[in-house]
Swiss-Prot record:
PANTHER family: CALCIUM CHANNEL FLOWER HOMOLOG (PTHR13314:SF2). Pfam families: Cg6151-P (PF10233). The keyword Zinc-finger does not apply. The record marks 79 as: Calcium ion selectivity. This is Calcium channel flower. Disulfide bonds: none annotated.
Amino acid sequence: MSFAEKITGLLARPNQQDPIGPEQPWYLKYGSRLLGIVAAFFAILFGLWNVFSIITLSVSCLVAGIIQMVAGFVVMLLEALCCFVCFEQVNVIADKVDSKPLYFRAGLYIAMAIPPIILCFGLASLFGSGLIFGTGVVYGMMALGKKASAEDMRAAAQQTFGGNTPAQTNDRAGIVNNAQPFSFTGAVGTDSNV
């Protein structure tokens, strides 16, 4: 068993039917899940740090810390079910979110990461929620899919729409027919040195 197979075996859920799809590389599928687990851990840890800011009477940082900890628990719930085996409804919630498209998860993670940063801008909220935001960005990129092959992009660029003539590619092609070229007749006059 190779190292990659061991890692994917650790990060795979039991009876998982490859919800992301076969078109995604294994390192992106499991890397996003690993990033989500690490992000959730640090969000909970730094959210707790923000909660302790009540000592300085900063209520907005207290609220931001609570929101950040809840966001960390939600991300941990969706990414690492093994941490919540004692709760029966966790599987139902995770399966429901897994059945949604990837852009739903991306939007959820990004939306959960923004309020703590706005309420209490500091290293703790920036790093903890920033990792969740990064996980949402990775899921968003996975939702966009991979880029088309070079042949497909060339074919799409050369298609004509509605009987239009294909685009001209020479240097003399202009937007307006019969347009006169720019001409410079000499050096620009000097300034009055003011």
